[in-house]
């Protein structure tokens, strides 16, 4: 399945999602690896097998095996970090902020792709997963590395569109009213 076939599966109530998917498919504001790694990481974070398969297939001709693994690692490591750091951020007890995380996350230091690509993918996944602490941390790293606010906003926009496609597919599976 590709982005085009994914668009074809979306019902009429998701027309805006279909149009937005077309927009990101044609968007060339990001470098190829940055864009397709971002889309794959976000698709995996959506936890929808059809969306993940569509974006994995779409990314196949645009990513090296190392970049594909890095995108998968971004979704995976943020799946862990977003839960932990969202808890730390939201818990009323300030003691949790002082405790060591004791979580292995070596891939962040050595992702196998340029640091800014990986950080952008982590930021987008963190937006999907709703971790404000991680969003702030990754946004700061990106800003300090000279990544523009427009690029950061584009990544989060792409994340929102991918997530909405997953929700639309799931909503379409609800049985019809009798």
Curated annotation (Swiss-Prot):
It catalyses: N(6)-[(R)-dihydrolipoyl]-L-lysyl-[lipoyl-carrier protein] + a hydroperoxide = N(6)-[(R)-lipoyl]-L-lysyl-[lipoyl-carrier protein] + an alcohol + H2O. Its EC number is 1.11.1.28. This is Alkyl hydroperoxide reductase AhpD. It comes from Methylocella silvestris (strain DSM 15510 / CIP 108128 / LMG 27833 / NCIMB 13906 / BL2). Coiled coil: none annotated. It comes from the Bacteria. GO terms for molecular function: alkyl hydroperoxide reductase activity; disulfide oxidoreductase activity; hydroperoxide reductase activity; peroxiredoxin activity. It holds the Pfam family CMD. One of its GO terms (biological process) is cell redox homeostasis. The gene is ahpD.
